[in-house]
Amino acid sequence: MNISDLFPEKIDYRKYLINNKLESLIGKNEISKTIKKTTNKNPFHNVNPKNNEPLPPEFDDLIRLHFIIKKRKATTVLEYGVGYSSIVLADAIFKNSQDNSIPKIRCSNLFELHSVDTSKEYINITKKRIPKRLSSIINFHFSNVTMSEFNGRICTLFDSNPNISPDIIYVDGPDQFSPTGDIRGISTRHSDRMPMVADILSMEHFLCPGTLIIFDGRTANARFVKSNLQRNWSYLYVEEFDQHFFELLETPLGEHNKKKIDYCLGEYYYERLNRTI
């Protein structure tokens, strides 16, 4: 996968923000600070179990997410970890739903975002930020996370996942201190550990060709998933964004999957597929 497969043209972040009216979703006061990613020089800032303060929005990440959802005409999105991303994803899905040229495709969760989180508090905070016009798009799911194994490798699994077939999976949760239990004394609840969610691996065989997975950071987790995926995935890591992308490139499963690929991704999907054959 090349970066141009995801972003055919360079994004003017501030122009995109204004043209898509995202400032009203995120908050003009927040946006006026900076669009670029901010970093904290304290190496323990993001791995402090006592730090309950939600991370501030990273506008460049949010704008790229919005762009990808619209560009790929995504209809069903699965998100791990709620926040500002939930609102931005829902807005992009809502705008996709306004397309008057949508063909009749087989999709039981058409134009829905399903967001999973381990914190009822963060779910409630996000709910309060959602504009009324997007409330029917977002479906929140609370679930605990448990230390587990995948093919004998220690990892974490959510106790419950929404029963959907997503076009895009965005992974930005859970944090490493949420999982309960341990496997032979090992858990992620240590500042030197890292998140290691494996739910995608357990559901891989259900995912349809054309599915895109995005890991926001979480490099160790993304590498674990990459080394255990079994189907024909195209992979890209973009250091500038610190994001990992996986696209499932396979021939369509049948006429219904093909019809959806043709509408959402177009002929360029088959060009990418042919590169892997």
Task: Describe the residue ranges of each PLM region.
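Short SAM/SAH-binding signature in class I
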Residues: 158-173, 179
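Conserved SAM-binding motif I beta-strand of class I
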Residues: 100-117
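Conserved class I S-adenosyl-L-methionine
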Residues: 73-83
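Rossmann-like AdoMet
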Residues: 1-58
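Conserved alpha-helix/loop element of class I SAM-dependent methyltransferases that forms part
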Residues: 60-73, 197-201
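S-adenosyl-L-methionine
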Residues: 119-165
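C-terminal substrate-binding/active-site "lid" region of AdoMet-derived donor-dependent transferases
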Residues: 175-277
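Conserved SAM-dependent methyltransferase scaffold
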Residues: 86-90
